[in-house]
Amino acid sequence: ILLKKPDAFLKELGDCYLMERDYEQMMPLFVRTLELNPGSIDNITVQLSFARSNDIVNSIDPVIEKTLKSLCQKTDYLPVFDELAVWYNLQIRNYLLALQHAVLLNNKSENKLHIFLNIALDAINNKAFDQATIAYQKILGKGKENNPFYLPARKGILTCRYEQLRQSPADRSDYLQIAGDCEKYMQEFGYTPTNIDILSLLAELYAYRLQRPDSADRLLDKAIRMPRLNSNTLSQLKSQRADLLTFMDNPWEATILYTQLEKANPNNDIGYEAKLKKAMLAYYAGDLLWAKAQFDVLKGATSKLISNDAIQMSHFIHMNYEAEGDNRDLEKMGRTEYLLYKQQFQEVLPRLDSLIGHCSPGISDYATLQKARSLCACFQDEEAAKLLSELKDRSEQVYIKAEALFQLAGLKRK
């Protein structure tokens, strides 16, 4: 009143109602803020995200939905409200409605194609692959000219198709088709540092889906020799090639690459991961004490995932190693895990059954965990869940019970 500006401090008043959780009063103020300043959309969505994360009784979503419905029923509502609708529908994973509003937004405004890219990435993260594909196709439909999102969409749709196939058993012909499309992409846009992600995807297809590991190795070697690669990309390619060499039963060259990665990345997760993988190679080969020493060093790694894996492996070896006794079962477990790494499931499962049936509880329970992993890799989730459920009830080892529960939770999230 004093300023004679009734629309002054709308956003600030809305923030006050937000803190009081009075969402019915908050939303009209945020809407008016967007009408006066559409550029404040990011600020408003940040505040709404905060409100949703602290809304323990789920009272804000009905208010947002009612507000959006009322706004979008008007004939000439502002494009910013389509943008708000896209944001909200991404939060609740309603990708089809998000796509509808993205189309409306792009019909009204220029330079909004990135909205489709955001939808696609979010959809892939939540395994909504069909909706992600539609979003990418909307970008590709605009053509190459004056379209900065054309190449990201071409790449994204290839990655999306591959991730979709990985979720269930797929025919070799499906992987061949994606590999062919990746090859066409590389021929069209070149073997350059900007296309390393597609080259890496093609190498993965060759190695693990099409039984052409030699082709994958040549491709990765070519990529590593590419000029003007940044150090992080080079490290990722070397790590991928070292993993492939391990898969190809060439642990010596893999160890050399992992050692190079360690030295080039002494204090980051790339180096720690290389050290972990090198320790796993020693474990596979039966060099148990050296492997355990490396796992012990990695217990303090900055990455929680690497640290947890190192702790688990160190504990497993410590609890089952006989300083003056026979460690053949432990060594056999290591060799069996190497077969599992190489995806030789027909050979792995009988070996695991033998270990489960004849070894001490420490090795038997651990072998059961690995059998569950093998079954999941073969898309036998129900059998894996049954095995894990029985294991968590019968095992007397705390870390085994915890890992069984963790894997069960992962299966339920599927």
Labelled PLM ranges:
Residues 1-414:
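Acidic, polar-rich low-complexity tracts and alpha-helical solenoid repeat scaffolds
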